[in-house]
Amino acid sequence: MFKFTFALALCVLAAGSALAQHNPHWWGNRNTIVHLFEWQWEDIAEECENFLGPRGFAGVQVSPANENIVSPGRPWWERYQPISYKLITRSGDEEQFADMVRRCNDVGVRIYVDVLLNHMSADFYGQAVGTAGTEADPATKSFPGVPYTAEDFHPSCQIYDWNDRFQIQQCELVGLKDLDQSRDHVRTKLIEFLDHLIELGVAGFRVDAAKHMASEDLEFIYGSLSDLKTEHGFPHNARPFIFQEVIDHGGQEVTREEYNSLGAVTEFRFWQEIGNAFRGNNAFKWLQSWGTDWGFFSSGQAFTFVDNHDNQRDGGAVLTYKIPRQYKMATAFHLAYPYGISRVMSSFAFDDHDSAPPQNAQEQLISPEFDSDGACVNGWICEHRWRQIYNMVGFKNAVRDTPVTNWWDNGDSQIAFCRGSKGFIAINNNLYDLAETLQTCLPAGVYCDVISGDLIHGSCSGKSVTVGNDGRAFVSIGSNDFDGVLAIHVDAKL
């Protein structure tokens, strides 16, 4: 009986720990993460203080923080080829990283680190040197900066069959040296690395290439991590938030369901379907059932996005900053509809798949610069600073925990809906105007359309919407308007 009771207790503790790893530890009503892709730590700290905190962003996903290989031309993907776990990259050193985390936490913006637990660097022609000056020999699987030797890796093989579990989880993803996470030494080093980041105050991790690691190995690693630190504003016994990259479009051997009990999982079907709809290939009327009815994960397990740093370079159905009108519309719907753990992208401009982030002649990352409207101008795109996006972050905060009500559509691709009595949004993706009197569910008054303008000192710089005593308002979105969206909420009342 004692053995049974003890085993049952362990199972309950494990289940509770896994459930806790779905909690992103946001402040107040904040509930949107932004990926500041390839930004420097000092610039992120300033962005937290000057923009993200005041605008109500919940957190930042940052690029990998540990030492990576130095590759000719400095392509973005060098950050995904680890050399050691020293916290020195082109984004900054450990002191700068720690300062960023502290300053962002102080203004209610959590930090989530992109971490690479699956692999180390691929083969490199010539001497492989990292961003901290550490030398390695990937060809012989020698990484003295950790240290790892050949026995810490799976035998080299390539992935040819994406329905072969062995190949997916033990062969080398695009030549990257595949760590054996079942080995005690590898587990210890990975846990030490993650615990060090926790000690510095991070709130959690994006786990790159999670499907290429056995879920039981990840369960052990996650379960061995320290609690988040109370001195950084986290409650006692808080577990790090885990969101895992698991690419699963259906019908594959390794599935997302193997990982969702361990933490949130990237919902890749979300971006496919939202891209398909907002490119005009699916009528918006079907979006009324958005979420699990579309085959998506349950909302609390799904990490959602319109695009990410990988797929925006791959073409296809994905929407990116290069199609700005549809991209803003899709992002507005993403942030208005109550489904998933939302992340928005903040990119740099690129012409080809391997383009480096903005850098100077010495190959040092450069800081973003801003025009008089606050938009980035020197190679950084900064979608999170587009009015149509940052104001929808505010909308999402204002309507948090309210349901979709009073759905309206025209039988095609003009839609509108309320979020309880807190907010209202209308979207027009037809080639003709939307001009309707619709139920907004809001108290009577005049509201600022946060898509076309900002509410500044009681005045709206864009369109205003008058709501009558019955909650109804005339809504107009022309087919050729600059934006195909209108959004109002209780915090945007004049």
Swiss-Prot record:
Keyword list (alphabetical) reads: Calcium, Carbohydrate metabolism, Chloride, Disulfide bond, Glycosidase, Hydrolase, Metal-binding, Pyrrolidone carboxylic acid, Secreted, Signal
Q: Which InterPro entries match?
A: A-amylase/branching_C, A-amylase_C, Alpha_amylase, Glyco_hydro_13_cat_dom, Glyco_hydro_b, Glycoside_hydrolase_SF
The protein's GO terms of the molecular function aspect are: alpha-amylase activity; metal ion binding
Record's signal peptide = 1-20
Cystines in this chain: 48-104, 157-171, 376-382, 418-441, 448-460
Which cofactor is essential here?
Answer: Ca(2+); chloride
Family matches, as SMART domains: Aamy (SM00642), Aamy_C (SM00632)
- Which superkingdom, per the lineage? Eukaryota
- Gene Ontology terms describing biological process: carbohydrate metabolic process
| Annotated EC | 3.2.1.1
The reactions it catalyses are: Endohydrolysis of (1->4)-alpha-D-glucosidic linkages in polysaccharides containing three or more (1->4)-alpha-linked D-glucose units
Could you say which enzyme class this protein belongs to?
A: hydrolase
Residue positions annotated to bind chloride are: 206, 308, 343
UniProt: Ca(2+) binding residues? 118, 169, 178, 212
Specify one Pfam family: Alpha-amylase_C
- Subunit comment: Monomer.
Name assigned to this protein: Alpha-amylase-related protein
Lineage in the entry?
Answer: Eukaryota, Metazoa, Ecdysozoa, Arthropoda, Hexapoda
Gene it is expressed from: Amyrel
